[in-house]
Amino acid sequence: MEVADKIFSPSYEGMHKYQGEWHIEINKLFPGYVFIQSENADQLETYLEHLSGTVTPVQIGGGFYPIRTEEQAFLKEMLDADDCVRYSLDYIVDGKLVVERGPLSGKTDHVRKIDRHKRIANLTIRLFGQDRQIRVGLEIPARLTVAEYQQQKAAT
């Protein structure tokens, strides 16, 4: 009997520098969490209750917590077919983050902190009815003025 359509653990591409070079690494987006997609939540809940000791589902207020529609839509926009948030290419233009390409496009209001040296953006997102902090990879090759950015865009 199939109770789950898909079981996955979302990840993100990050960069790590070792041996003098930057390397892409895949990291867990929500360490310790596994997501289960199912059309029959009641049947899934019953099945999971019988797996005592094997799995501890997220329970808030005594029950299993499904992801809300808007939370699910946000995650689907960020994740690719492999359930991974890929690297974004961004610029800082006159002190503001401008996303050139990648999953952060249109989501700069969620960015709380940028670490250019580690090539990481810390985001605040809504998940399980609460604000959660996540990290995603990004590349910021330069800080530019508006004129420099427009000149660069015109050249490409």
Q: What residue ranges belong to the model's regions?
A:
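Short beta-strand-centered aromatic/proline hotspots
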Residues: 106-114
